[in-house]
Amino acid sequence: MERIKRFLKSFLLFELLKGMKVTGRYLFAPKVTVHYPEEKTPQSPRFRGLHALRRYPNGEERCIACKLCEAVCPALAITIESEQRDDGTRRTTRYDIDLIKCIFCGFCEEACPVDAIVETRVLEYHGEVRGDLTYTKEMLLAVGDRYEEQIAKDRAADAPYR
């Protein structure tokens, strides 16, 4: 009896029919394709894109040169140099992020005690040569200034989960 069952399964191509059933189900299902440049999918407030350095409302940069982000970066993509000010506080003289090395894990953002470094929703950036994707302090501050309103909204939406 078992031999007959096995023969019928192989003769009727039972596995092939099961596969065709799955194919047919997805063939007539609604499509989920997004035509990227014209259409964009919604992004989460927690999206980790291009980095930015933030400023306080009075215009002073937030980074206190504690170097926690540099220490926690698993890809060693962050380079920080700092100096002591006359009033005894430390400030960065150099803050570079190599986006080629960066794995966008968000550890730098979590480690920062003053929310100076954040990851924005900016997904589209490019460079023509390798050095174009090393963002300096000035470039990161410019990104932060440009997207501060969106960053503040995302931080407020994420606040209950922090």
Curated annotation (Swiss-Prot):
- EC number of the protein: 7.1.1.-
Record: residues binding [4Fe-4S] cluster 2:
C73, C102, C105, C108
The cellular location(s) given in this protein's UniProt record come to: Cell inner membrane
* Record text on cofactor binding: Binds 2 [4Fe-4S] clusters per subunit.
Q: Which residues bind [4Fe-4S] cluster 1?
A: C63, C66, C69, C112
Offer an example of a GO molecular function term for this protein. Answer: iron ion binding
- The record places domain 4Fe-4S ferredoxin-type at 53-83, 93-122
Q: Which domain of life is it from?
A: Bacteria
Cofactors that this protein relies on:
[4Fe-4S] cluster
Its GO biological process annotations read: aerobic respiration
Cytoplasm listed as a keyword: no
So what does this thing catalyse?
Answer: a quinone + NADH + 5 H(+)(in) = a quinol + NAD(+) + 4 H(+)(out)
Task: Output the Gene Ontology cellular-component terms.
Answer: plasma membrane
Tell me the Pfam families matching this sequence.
Fer4_7
- UniProtKB keywords: 4Fe-4S, Cell inner membrane, Cell membrane, Iron, Iron-sulfur, Membrane, Metal-binding, NAD, Quinone, Repeat, Translocase, Ubiquinone
Specify the protein's topology with respect to the membrane. Answer: Peripheral membrane protein
Q: Tell me, what does this protein do in biology?
A: NDH-1 shuttles electrons from NADH, via FMN and iron-sulfur (Fe-S) centers, to quinones in the respiratory chain. The immediate electron acceptor for the enzyme in this species is believed to be ubiquinone. Couples the redox reaction to proton translocation (for every two electrons transferred, four hydrogen ions are translocated across the cytoplasmic membrane), and thus conserves the redox energy in a proton gradient.
Q: Which family does it belong to?
A: Belongs to the complex I 23 kDa subunit family.
List, alphabetically, the HAMAP family matched: NDH1_NuoI
Descriptive protein name:
NADH-quinone oxidoreductase subunit I
Organism source for this protein? Nitrosomonas eutropha (strain DSM 101675 / C91 / Nm57)
Q: What is the lineage of its organism?
A: Bacteria, Pseudomonadati, Pseudomonadota, Betaproteobacteria, Nitrosomonadales
